[in-house]
Amino acid sequence: MLKTLLVQWLVFFFFFLIGSVVTAAEDDGSLSLCNCDDEDSLFSYETILNSQKVGDFLIAIAYFSIPIELVYFVSRTNVPSPYNWVVCEFIAFIVLCGMTHLLAGFTYGPHWPWVMTAVTVFKMLTGIVSFLTALSLVTLLPLLLKAKVREFMLSKKTRELDREVGIIMKQTETSLHVRMLTTKIRTSLDRHTILYTTLVELSKTLGLKNCAVWIPNEIKTEMNLTHELRPRIDDENENEHFGGYAGFSIPISESDVVRIKRSEEVNMLSPGSVLASVTSRGKSGPTVGIRVPMLRVCNFKGGTPEAIHMCYAILVCVLPLRQPQAWTYQELEIVKVVADQVAVAISHAVILEESQLMREKLAEQNRALQVARENALRANQAKAAFEQMMSDAMRCPVRSILGLLPLILQDGKLPENQTVIVDAMRRTSELLVQLVNNAGDINNGTIRAAETHYFSLHSVVKESACVARCLCMANGFGFSAEVYRALPDYVVGDDRKVFQAILHMLGVLMNRKIKGNVTFWVFPESGNSDVSERKDIQEAVWRHCYSKEYMEVRFGFEVTAEGEESSSSSSGSNLEEEEENPSLNACQNIVKYMQGNIRVVEDGLGLVKSVSVVFRFQLRRSMMSRGGGYSGETFRTSTPPSTSH
């Protein structure tokens, strides 16, 4: 800058001197001769000679300093070989010029003769070197022009590199802004906090006038202004001018709304757009809008969240009105990336909200289950207490009876028929106690194993016949019994289960509406149960009993009613009666438990005519050898049916 000013000042001074001389000549009318001899003049002869001498010495000093600078420059830089001769010629030319001016400074006064000779020689050398230098410039100028072109290309490349560096720096700055915005957005897990943080940070980064989020309503008919950077001020003038923005809504069929939702890119909004005018509160600056996917409902079937319906919100950004610049590419990229990050953050927040909601529901269900469990536990405790009370209430009188029965049999003076009745009462009471105990065990979740022991089969048959006679007479049935004396007395088994099964079989027949005569029969099972052939197979049965350790005995009841019609039984009524008869079901369970067989025969009316079961007992030969009273005859007793019914 200083060098330029100095050159301009020297040029101005040169033209000023020329102008002064021309003006003086015009004033005199003719060119006057130099008055160098005038001693009073400023430019006297002495002064001019001294000035020229000083000028020559200064020029010589300057010329001698320039080669020194050139030599220093050449030594500090790598000058290509084609330019070395040119530099040397310039150095020689400048040195000769300096010597010429230096020697010329000694010629303005008295001097030696060799000074003029030296001046002449150096002037000749200077002329020759200057001519050679001029010839060298003819070949040097194209190289200089080529270097200039190369310099221009390098400067152009430099400008392009500067522009690319600027773009890279802008991209880096954009990525930093996006990373900062993403960090701010991801700091919260609440949807409303995420949206509000997005508006605040985006406005700070881009210098926005306003920023708002429009979300569709539940029925997808309108877009509601739900989140805004600057809250509305409800003053009368603003409400009158803009119609009041509190709870503002626009139809979802608006052209800008449809255009933004159909595109994934950032869309520019015109100044007359409803979205732009409402978001900017009147006159809008450069405005853009972009859709933001929002996940509302999740389905967690199979552990994978599935979007039921995609919902799009709209993010609207407005620049200040007086800002001369419009939206840049980097700013649009920031808005697009931020919208994507907001969509991801909102989807994560929705999934967490759904998980929290499911957790709360599960906790509520768990509390309800705990309450139901406590209620069920209290109900079970109450039920167990009630059953225990009922069991105790049933056991007490039965145990009293069991305690009195031995006192009755203590004297041994009772007739045989009364003794049988007392034994039947004892066995019935024991069976009742066992049933009560079994009911308590089932309620407690425990099952007792089968109690197998030696017992008297004859006693069980007699007591069963006694109880059956009493029940039949009480219900208006006649009773008769057919028991084969060929049965062994002592066998191994569960006498209580046998007695219980016999009573259940009798209970099946007691449900008949048509009365009649009930026949109770007991005989060994040998593969043929026809009554007419029973006597013929007694000897074979005895051989079968003594040849094996086990014996099968059939117990059965049969009803004979007067006026019985013969017709084919219906299988459907049979099944229905079996399902409705609890005694038959209980009997079947006992038979299944003891691994026996049951047989039910129906008459023409679909009523049960006979029921029989087959049980397998283990024989005791020592006991059988003492039962020598077996003659193979049939013991029969009968009681006619009651006519009062």
Swiss-Prot record:
SUPFAM superfamilies to which the protein is assigned, alphabetical: GAF domain-like, Homodimeric domain of signal transducing histidine kinase
Main location (coarse class): endoplasmic reticulum
Substitution effect: residue 94 to F: In ers2-2; ethylene insensitivity
Domain spans labelled Histidine kinase: 389-623
Mode of membrane association: Multi-pass membrane protein
Entry keyword Transmembrane: yes
GO molecular function: ATP binding; ethylene binding; identical protein binding; metal ion binding; phosphorelay sensor kinase activity; protein serine/threonine kinase activity
Record's protein name: Ethylene response sensor 2
Gene that this polypeptide is encoded by: ERS2
